[in-house]
Structures are given as C-alpha cells and as structure tokens.
C-alpha cells in the first residue's frame, strides 16, 4: 500500500496541480525548480519505492562500503516538502493513466493499490530499469542487480558471507562496485561481453588505461567473455559461473550490471512517441505537446551547441537529470527555454576518479596526457581541430579546463596540450 509524507494531499476527488511520476533526481529537481520559478499549485511527487527520494551514485561505492549512512543519501527533509507544498507518495506504482477528454493535459493516474491521482499537468521522470541477464540460474539467490536502495541493501547483506564475487558488465556501475568489493577484501572477477571496458562512454585509450589500472589493483578482468550458466550449490545458492568455453569460476555473489532499459511503459499507455526512451523536443515536451519528460528516460535533441538538428541522444547522468529538469520546469511555467549545454559525467572506481566533459562521438584526433609521476591521465578528443570532449582520470584540473573551453565555445591547442607539464587552462583560446 502507498504511504505519504510531506504536505497534505488534495482532498478526495480534487486534482493536484502537477503529478510527477518518478521520485528520481529529475523528479526532485523538477519540483524544486518549479517552486523557485513561482509555481504556486500543489505538486504530488510519486515513486514506487518505500523510501524518501535519495541519491543513487553512492550505492555502489561509499554506502556499500559503510562509509556513509542512509540519511546522507536523502535529498530533502520532510519539512522541506511540507514547506514547499509537495506531497510525497511512496510505494506506489502507476499502472494506467486516463486522459481528460476535454483537457488532454489533465487526467487521472491509477495506482497498483487502486488509488487514483487526478492531475492538471503530468510529468514523467521515471528513469530506467536494469537490463536482465537471460541465462540458466539467473534468478538464483546470490544473483543481484544494483539500481536502487533495496538492491544495494540486498547486496550489502550478502557481502559478509562471500569470498568470491563475479561482476557481469564492465561499465560504470560494474566497475565501481567491483572496485568497492575488492577494497572490502573480496576476490572479484569482472566479465565483459565486449572487447573493451566502458565501451559506450570512453575511447580506446581510456578503456585501456582502466583495464590496466584495475588489473594492477588485483581485479581479474576478462574481455569478450560470455556466461553460459550460473550454477547452484546443494542449497540452491550461487556457487559458480560457467562460461561458454566451459570454464567454471567460483562465486557466492553474481552482480549484474549490463546496462539499463528506459521505462517507457506509461508513455506507451499515453500514446507518446517512444524510441530508445520517450521522445521529447528541446523543451522537454513529449509528442502530445503537453506531457513533460525529463532525465534518463528522455530521448532528446543533442544539447551540445552546434550539433546537427536531427541528432538525438539519451543521457544517463546526474548532471543531465538536474539540468533537463530545470528546462522542464520552464516549460511548465510557459517559458520557452531550450536544453543546451555541455554534458559531463563522473565515475569513482576505487582510488580513480574519472571525469568526462563533452561527448566524444565523431572525433578524428586524440591527445593523451599521462602524468605517471602524479598518477594523472587524460585523453582530449578533437574533431576538425576543435576540442569536443575529454576523459580525465585523477586529473580534475584538466577536466575543469576542458569544461570551461567547451562551455565558452573556445579551443585548447592540441600541440600544446600534448605537454603534460602545461596547464590546459593556459591554452584556452
């Protein structure tokens, strides 16, 4: 059954001014931005977890290792929601939405509990769900995913009794968790189906850097490796993974991080255009012209200035969740603000902090800055002589310089950047 926090809900039968489905980073930001812009109607923020809205990045790192507690993850206090006239609905999943025939922007959302939520405007900040691994034994106790707080708690409860952990997937989540678990004393094997680590997000040089770094720190990282079956012990718990070549690797935990699938079910119910997410315009408005969509679930025009008009992208990052929600708030206020900016990302993998500025798609030149003395590594990406992105490992000054150059539509001379002793900020022109 749903539970409630924050401000009082509207009286039975009365509509909330805005129903935000998805108590995510974007959902929280959207509510806060609307209040900052002067939106004075009641807001309902609805999520399907039995928790107050919280930050997810630490789940695979500091929280898993016990370095931070639950309260440090919570976005806002209950008093904040009361003061901002926002009702939190927890532990509720919307299963259907019926539009108002006379006002397409309004309607009624129907929850799994049977409760109804009338609204005058609707926003979807529903994020994405883990892609499932379809193999024999994939549902055994000890097979876990890591997308939300309950997933993280399940993993944390399993860790003390485990010696060997297999992480399936060499992306951000998999490598963050693998590094954390290794630091907790576990024998960790990373199995990546593709030919390189973090293949969707970084270039070859950065991928090679992380492969070498994780192996040097004690992780067993295997590329182009596929699982045939997850094997149970006599009690039905995970005991090993069998690879397609027949090798068996011992494990008491199998953590799967092979990407996510955008949650488009409600959009499909509403008849919205869907294509690798919910299709929106530059103002975070869906194809019906009324529904607002923000965050990981949104397939949007590429926000990088100068991108081709027909180029679209779906971004999964805290930065995008926040900035896209701000644009969505403007749209709800009737102000025409386009989403434009330089995407940036980060990933903490043990003692390595990766920061990415820009999008490297279409690069034709790279400059590698490897300061082995100070443990810093950066790859700068250029297209037609113009810097377009950078991957920076333990090199925050490089990251900040590239972000500054990109945000001001300036360049960083490639020849000068090749000298690691030169501060990149001095080359911005």
What is the role of each PLM region?
Residues 1-21, 74-166, 242-244, 255-257, ...:
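FAD-binding core/adjacent interface of flavoenzyme oxidoreductases
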Residues 2-17, 23, 36, 297-398:
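Mid-to-C-terminal Rossmann-like scaffold of FAD/NAD(P)H-dependent oxidoreductases
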Residues 3-87, 180-201, 401:
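Beta1-alpha1 glycine-rich phosphate/pyrophosphate-binding loop at the start
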Residues 17, 239, 249-273, 352-429:
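C-terminal catalytic lobe of FAD-dependent flavoproteins
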Residues 23, 46-48, 148, 170, ...:
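Cofactor-binding loop segments of dinucleotide-utilizing enzymes, especially the Rossmann-like FAD-
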Residues 24-28, 50, 128-130, 150, ...:
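Residue-level detector of alpha-helix initiation sites
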Residues 40, 82-111, 117, 184-280:
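A Rossmann-like FAD-binding core segment of flavoenzymes
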Residues 139-160, 237, 242, 246-327:
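FAD-site-proximal beta/loop scaffold in flavoenzymes
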């Amino acid at each position: 059954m749903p539970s409630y926090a924050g401000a009082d809900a509207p009286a039975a039968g009365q509509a909330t001014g805005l129903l935000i489905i998805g108590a995510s980073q974007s959902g929280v930001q959207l509510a806060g931005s609307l209040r900052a812009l002067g939106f004075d109607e009641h807001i309902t923020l609805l999520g399907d977890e039995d928790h107050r809205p919280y930050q997810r990045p630490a789940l695979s790192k500091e929280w898993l290792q016990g370095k931070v507690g639950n309260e440090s993850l919570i976005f806002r206090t209950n008093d904040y929601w009361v003061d901002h006239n926002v009702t939190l609905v927890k532990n509720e999943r919307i299963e259907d939405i019926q539009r108002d025939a006379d006002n397409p922007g309004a309607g009624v959302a129907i929850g799994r509990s049977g409760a109804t939520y009338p609204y005058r405007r609707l926003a979807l900040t529903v994020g994405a769900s883990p892609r499932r691994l379809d193999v024999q034994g994939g549902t055994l106790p000890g097979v876990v995913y890591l997308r939300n707080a309950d997933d993280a708690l399940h993993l944390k409860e399993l860790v003390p009794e485990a010696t060997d952990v297999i992480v399936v997937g060499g992306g951000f989540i998999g490598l963050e968790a693998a590094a954390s678990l290794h630091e907790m004393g576990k024998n960790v094997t990373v199995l990546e189906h593709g030919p390189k680590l973090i293949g969707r997000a970084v270039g070859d040089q950065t991928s090679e850097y992380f492969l070498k770094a994780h192996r040097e720190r004690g992780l067993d990282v295997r590329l182009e490796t596929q699982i045939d079956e997850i094997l149970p012990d006599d009690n039905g718990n995970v005991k090993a993974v069998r690879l397609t070549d027949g090798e068996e690797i011992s494990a008491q935990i199998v953590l799967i991080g092979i990407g996510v699938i955008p949650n488009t079910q409600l959009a499909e119910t509403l008849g919205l255009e869907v294509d690798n997410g919910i299709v929106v315009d530059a103002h975070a408005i869906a194809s019906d012209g009324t529904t607002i969509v923000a965050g990981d679930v949104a397939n949007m025009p590429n926000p990088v200035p100068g991108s081709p008009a027909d180029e679209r992208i779906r971004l999964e990052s805290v930065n995008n969740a926040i900035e896209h929600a701000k644009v969505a708030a403007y749209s709800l206020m009737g102000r025409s603000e386009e989403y434009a900016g330089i995407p940036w990302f980060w990933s903490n993998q043990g003692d390595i902090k990766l920061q990415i500025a820009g999008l490297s798609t279409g690069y034709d030149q790279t400059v590698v800055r490897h300061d082995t003395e100070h443990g810093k590594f950066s790859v700068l990406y250029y297209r037609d002589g113009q810097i377009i992105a950078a991957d920076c490992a333990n090199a925050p000054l490089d990251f900040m310089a590239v972000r500054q150059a990109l945000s001001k539509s300036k360049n960083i001379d490639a020849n000068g950047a090749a000298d690691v002793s030169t501060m990149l900020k001095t080359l911005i022109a």
